[in-house]
Amino acid sequence: MAMASVSNDLGAEGLVAGASVLSRPAEEFDNDPSVEAMWAMKALEHAEVYFNILCSVDPKLLKLTPHDENIYKTFREEFPDLSVEKLNEEKLKSPEAKQKWRPFCEKFKGVVEDYSFGTLLRLDNEGEYSNENSILVTRIQFYAIELARNKEGLNDCIRSKYKPTKSSKNQ
């Protein structure tokens, strides 16, 4: 849609009102519960689809993005000693960890679609998604850690331990 079309549709009053709203501090706005619920459903859907794929296919053969090799190589260069078997929140979200993760994530801005979207990650690679075994990370952190788990054979146990399930969306 052309910008002229937007301004014609809104008119001068609409544009001024929009500009005044956008110039207000973010703290003045509450999170819309319906938007949060839709986001949570989308994150859960992504987790279910990924886990069902893990239950069905040899993880070493999985291709998550067109940039898998670059993501994995960069991840292991920057985090050579990070064990991805059993993670804890501190390793991903402490101030020190955030300082190290931020530049890694930003390398994929404009490269990996939705690189900064919130995505659920399993803390223990041998477990399924659950309240106790899931944490919210950026999409690029999810890709980096799951690619490492897949390439390093850590997700191999999933196919024998779990079976694909129907999506909660269809129930």
Kindly give the residue locations of the regions a language model identified:
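Histidine-centered nuclease catalytic patch
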Residues: 102-133
